[in-house]
């Protein structure tokens, strides 16, 4: 609910790949690059509308924008973010603001660690807490003042939010402020959730944690997650740990269901994920294969280190629009190191006076607009509301939004469009439930007229997503066998009785071999002299 359980995608790249649109990488030479960009200017792919339903975090937005510079064809992107409540959308706005924070405020490593802290830790560093509060005040000005929004982040569009959702944004940003009455005892909420989930197994929870990781998540693509970081997250809610940091402040961006009660707030406590973790979005794979090295199941690098490396790449590309070269000395090999996990510190709320103000304009990303959509529109999309018809070129939907999927939903997709559905692969649910979910989803999309963008019948693998496309072209659906296999020389005649299985071998016919080949002809005579072949009957 508060983070996705699938890896970040470059949604534009997925679209190009699904429809086999040629988009050669831009050359490194500056003159050749300019010529290629001019040649791509007349391309008919001018605008793409992208809908992200229940993304829970801005991982797809960040990667899509970061990799935008690599494409020769760069259409205008309209990205629509639709989540279940205003607090999650406010959190997404904050995380997107961190990714696009002015470079004068933070260096690359500090920005990455700040993002990781706010993104995946229930208890955060004091510096992250200060940023959350100060940035919350800036975001509050943005959602209540159109001029301030255009000055700081003109790429954001909140016209799709109703006044109720804007009030929800205002309550979230206000709740983040360090006031004594804004209480969020996340450590207590976390323990309550864990006790309720495990029941009588709580006293032996370390064994339950190891089982979920070793027997489930690692078997489904989570090999990069180390047991120490996973157990510590399951115990405390702190996923990303570095030895030089101490965590003592509650991460109030995880609070949902805020309701005013005088100057105080009532909320639902912590209702997010407590089984998979925030490792999937950026921490499962990286382009540097050396970082996936492991010995007897012990990784050299943690999912935390992979997350750090990937975010440094994306944030560097967002800022410079150039390729990132990773400095190997920055990544610390803590995969097989047993870090001393000290108890979480107590925290004291303090006045907001004297904190830094993060009110500089965001990094400019030309040709991109991010629209925040009212959560109420999810029901309208399910019913096939006319104002959404033929709107989107790319749709991503989280697995927990599957109940909103219907045949009418696909009316919102254009004639040539891509649909990506997150699966339950990286949950700890039983294998049969994961397979049942995939089967139902495939059947629904097939009934709606969508065609698989990947040959799922031929590839017997584990799917983190299901990718289907809607196309107006008369294309043949991929089959399990893509090439016609040569026919057998032996054919059955439906009118012939071949007898019992033991006698079936008498129906074999040896083709006539030219007599010029004396060696083969001699072998043929020996085989015929031995009589018909019989199956072995002396089974143990």
From Swiss-Prot:
Assigned GO CC terms: cytosol; dynein axonemal particle
Tagged with keyword Isomerase: no
Residue ranges of the region described as Disordered: 480-499
Annotated localization: Cytoplasm; Dynein axonemal particle
Primary site of residence: cytoplasm
A GO BP annotation: sperm flagellum assembly
Protein's UniProt keywords contain Cytoplasm: yes
Keyword annotations of the record: Cilium biogenesis/degradation, Cytoplasm
Entry comment describing in which tissues the protein is expressed: Expressed in mechanosensory chordotonal (Ch) neurons, spermatocytes and spermatids (at protein level).
UniProt superkingdom: Eukaryota
Family statement: Belongs to the DNAAF3 family.
Protein name per its UniProtKB record: Dynein axonemal assembly factor 3 homolog
């Amino acid at each position: 609910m508060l983070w996705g359980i699938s890896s970040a995608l470059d949604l534009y790249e997925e679209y190009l790949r699904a429809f086999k649109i040629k988009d050669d990488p831009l050359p490194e030479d500056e003159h050749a690059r300019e010529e290629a960009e001019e040649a791509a200017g007349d391309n008919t792919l001018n605008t793409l509308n992208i809908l992200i339903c229940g993304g829970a975090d801005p991982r797809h937005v960040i990667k899509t924008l970061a990799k935008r510079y690599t494409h020769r064809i760069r259409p205008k992107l309209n990205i629509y973010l639709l989540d279940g409540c205003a607090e999650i959308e406010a959190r997404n706005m904050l995380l997107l603001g961190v990714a696009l924070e002015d470079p004068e405020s933070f260096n690359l490593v500090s920005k990455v660690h700040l993002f990781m802290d706010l993104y995946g830790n229930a208890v955060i560093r004091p510096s992250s807490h200060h940023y959350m509060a100060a940035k919350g005040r800036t975001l509050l000005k943005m959602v209540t003042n159109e001029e301030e929004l255009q000055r700081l982040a003109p790429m954001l569009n909140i016209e799709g939010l109703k006044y109720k959702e804007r009030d929800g944004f205002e309550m979230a940003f206000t709740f983040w402020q360090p006031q004594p009455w804004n209480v969020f005892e996340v450590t207590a909420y976390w323990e309550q959730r864990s006790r309720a989930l495990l029941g009588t197994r709580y006293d032996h929870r370390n064994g339950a944690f190891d089982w979920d990781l070793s027997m489930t998540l690692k078997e489904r693509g989570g090999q990069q997650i180390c047991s120490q970081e996973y157990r510590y997250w399951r115990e405390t809610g702190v996923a990303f740990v570095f030895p030089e940091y101490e965590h003592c402040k509650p991460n109030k961006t995880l609070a949902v269901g805020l309701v005013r009660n005088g100057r105080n707030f009532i909320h639902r406590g912590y209702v997010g994920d407590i089984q998979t973790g925030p490792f999937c979005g950026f921490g499962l794979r990286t382009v540097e294969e050396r970082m996936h090295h492991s010995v007897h199941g012990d990784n050299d690098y943690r999912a935390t280190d992979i997350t750090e490396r990937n975010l440094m790449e994306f944030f560097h590309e967002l800022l410079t629009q150039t390729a990132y070269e990773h400095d190997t000395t920055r990544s610390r090999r803590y995969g097989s190191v047993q870090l001393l996990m000290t108890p979480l510190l107590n925290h004291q709320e303090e006045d907001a006076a004297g904190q830094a103000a993060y009110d500089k304009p965001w990094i400019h990303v030309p040709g991109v607009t991010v629209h925040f959509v009212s959560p109420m529109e999810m029901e309208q999309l399910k019913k096939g509301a006319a104002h959404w018809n033929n709107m989107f070129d790319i749709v991503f939907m989280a697995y927990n939004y599957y109940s909103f999927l219907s045949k009418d939903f696909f009316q919102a997709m254009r004639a040539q469009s891509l649909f990506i559905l997150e699966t339950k692969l990286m949950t700890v649910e039983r294998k049969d439930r994961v397979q049942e979910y995939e089967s139902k989803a495939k059947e629904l999309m097939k009934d709606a007229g969508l065609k698989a963008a990947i040959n799922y019948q031929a590839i017997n693998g584990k799917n983190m997503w299901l990718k289907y496309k809607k196309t107006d072209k008369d294309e043949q659906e991929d089959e399990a066998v893509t090439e016609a296999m040569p026919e057998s020389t032996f054919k059955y005649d439906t009118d012939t009785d071949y007898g019992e299985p033991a006698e079936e071998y008498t129906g074999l016919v040896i083709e006539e071999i030219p007599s010029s080949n004396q060696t083969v002809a001699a072998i043929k005579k020996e085989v015929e002299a031995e009589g018909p072949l019989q199956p072995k009957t002396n089974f143990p």
